[in-house]
Every structure is written in structure tokens, then in C-alpha cells.
Amino acid sequence: MSGHNKWSTIKHKKGAADAKRGKVFTKIIKEITVAAKLGGGDPDGNPRLRTAIDKAKGENMPKDNVERAIKKGVGGLEGTTYEETTYEGYGPGGTAVLVEVMTDNRNRTVSDVRSIFTKCNGNMGESGCVSWLFDKKGLLVFPKSIDFDKLFEASIEAGADDVTDEDEQYEVLTDPAAFHQVKTALEGAGFKAESAEITMIPQTMVKLEGKNAENMLKLMDRMEDNDDVQNVYANFDISEEEMEKMM
């Protein structure tokens, strides 16, 4: 299984995704608000907002919530002002970790993030210490029920960089600038993605087992539980056998 999707698969198996639905809504609302503030309230002219709205639809978020977040972003409603930043560090076993946050209190957030790193046998690093180990990409995930050859052909024709056949799904990778063009073209050709996002994909993976694997999952869980954290990316790989031991 490709590493960049390892964490979402693990969460699904643990049944953690549904339990954190409320937090997912909160994070998407923040993203919509900031995207609208920076690029305007029209998704057609604001790719970042369009991606956030698509994510909201994928989570079945009520339309009212989406519209309220856009209004707040463009100044139609009073609300908290968020600052975006990315923290970098090392997880168990020398893994590389990127933590994207949106916060109204940077001091609180940096303290929380540093504490999570420390408690999970990792440490927070300087800006730039691990970001070079990741590439920003558009990622579309498709079910195995569709025809791979047809998906491959349509994806490359639409401008995708690569299409891979993974253990449990097909993955289409794009340049971030071509993400919406590829997604729209594939939808037009009848291919419905299970998920579609701009993400950070690790160039190399670090295999973890035993205590390191346990601490890594704990770190990912705690980071995602933090209200200020929007996304966490890490280059760990844990085998199916190792996962079974921990569950």
C-alpha cells in the first residue's frame, strides 16, 4: 500500500473516522473560511475554495454550514481570524512529519504541537527540516470496481502525472495546478472519485514496528485530535501484520 494513504486506511480500520466526524466538520469550515477570505467567495475563480467545498460535500456537510463559512470568510459575518502555518519535526524511528495548522493563538498551538511530538517519542524541528522530503500533489482515489485501463487512459489524457494500481484502490496523481482540470475531466468521463484532495506525498517511506509503530499512530491520533491542526503528513509504513498485533 502506498504510504501517503496508509493513515486514512488505518483510521478506517480502527473505526476512528466516524467518531471524529464533528472535528472533521470544524476543520473543513475553517478551511472554507480561510479560502474564501484569501481568494473570494466564488468557487469557480477560487480553486482552493472549490476543493474545500468538494470535501464538505464528500462528508455530507449541510449546505447552510458551507454558505455560512463562505460569508464569514468574505467578511459578511463576524468571527475569529485564523493564521496558517506549518510545523515540521521527527516522529518515532526517524520519520518525517509535517503538521499544517490554522490557529487564532500561535503560542498555544506551537506549545501543543511540541508537546505531542515529545510525548510520542519524537521532536519538533526547524522550519524546512523535513518538508523537502515531500511533494505537493493532487490525489484522486478510485474504487477497484472500475476498469483500470480506461481510467488510466482518461487520466493521462486529462493531464494526470501518474496512475497506480494499489492494494485496495486506484490512485491518480496530478500537479496541484492541474488537479481540478483532471478531476472535472474524469467526472465528465463517468469516473467518480472516492476522495480527491491536494496533499503532501512522501518521497521515501520509513518502515516501523513494535513500540515505534505504536507511538507513531499515537502521534497521528493526537495531532488530528487537536482543534488547531488541519492536516498531518508523515512518511511511515506499518505492515498489515504489525497492525494486527496492535489492534
From Swiss-Prot:
Its main location: cytoplasm. One of its GO terms (cellular component) is cytosol. GO terms for molecular function: DNA binding. Keywords: Cytoplasm, DNA-binding, Transcription, Transcription regulation. InterPro entries: Integrase-like_N, TACO1_YebC-like_2nd/3rd_dom, TACO1_YebC_N, Transcrip_reg_TACO1-like, Transcrip_reg_TACO1-like_dom3, YebC-like. It is found in: Cytoplasm. Gene3D superfamilies: 1.10.10.200, 3.30.70.980. It comes from the Bacteria. One of its GO terms (biological process) is regulation of DNA-templated transcription. Belongs to the TACO1 family. PANTHER family: TRANSCRIPTIONAL REGULATORY PROTEIN YEBC-RELATED (PTHR12532:SF6), TRANSLATIONAL ACTIVATOR OF CYTOCHROME C OXIDASE 1 (PTHR12532). This is Probable transcriptional regulatory protein Gbem_3313. It comes from Citrifermentans bemidjiense (strain ATCC BAA-1014 / DSM 16622 / JCM 12645 / Bem) (Geobacter bemidjiensis). The lineage of its organism: Bacteria, Pseudomonadati, Thermodesulfobacteriota, Desulfuromonadia, Geobacterales.
